[in-house]
């Protein structure tokens, strides 16, 4: 049986299929974790410890050695993505209930969902697109994109926009596993290679644990708004990223288009934020479902838009 190959045909499948399976389990048997206990409960409810290990391993993949040009390219994209997420948070905070829109075509939409979907780029998708349509320097920009992994950037955006106040120690706790992994990965290349293997292995596990916080009715309730959110991520972040790549990064804009996606890891952000800022707890389940939809939508549309833009540039230069 070719289960892995089949799952990977769906964009973000290694995250989203286990997430859906977890949601099915939670819908049919909400008390499964507490009833089974022990290791089964850890697998069902262990989102935070599983993600802690994943953040550590992600940190180990970030290499300190990078040319100034690569840092300029990646820095311009990362800072632009974060700036747009912050701007959206500031503009939408007075318009959206903190617990999310209760019904209608925007059902479940909240500032938490917007920030989580917009502040983290799908680094794997970006690197793959740049290997095909960009240069080695473009692909190398994924170096700084790894820093977006985890809830830290979302915490900073929500704090800077006045929507939340976090204890400084929570910021330290959020970034410490990433920094420890970063330190070890740069001290020993063999350790970097060793830990890097786990970054993909752990994805279905935290996807399943996250799914066990969702109900299928929540996913169905937010279906249309999830598609709209995915399109909004591309529209709102895509043009600024394109311009930043051209004007600041020194590229032709292709890298900017390729960076206008939502990372699979962003699906975990709402639950993690809600655990640190309880006022977001009512919005977290719907936000998780919305971000999962945005991952699928952007994973489908961004490669098409990147290819169209790159070919248009080739046609013009020719």
Swiss-Prot record:
UniProt KW Cell membrane keyword: yes
One GO term describing the cellular component: plasma membrane
Transmembrane segments: 10-30, 42-62, 82-102, 109-129, 139-159, 163-183, 194-214, 224-244, 257-277, 289-309
Subcellular location: Cell inner membrane
Pfam annotation, one family: KdgT
UniProt-listed InterPro entries: 2keto-3dGluconate_permease (IPR004684), 2keto-3dGluconate_permease_sub (IPR018395)
Catalyzed chemical reaction(s): 2-dehydro-3-deoxy-D-gluconate(in) + H(+)(in) = 2-dehydro-3-deoxy-D-gluconate(out) + H(+)(out)
Membership in a protein family: Belongs to the KdgT transporter family.
Function: Catalyzes the proton-dependent uptake of 2-keto-3-deoxygluconate (KDG) into the cell.
Protein name per UniProt: 2-keto-3-deoxygluconate permease
Species: Xanthomonas euvesicatoria pv. vesicatoria (strain 85-10)
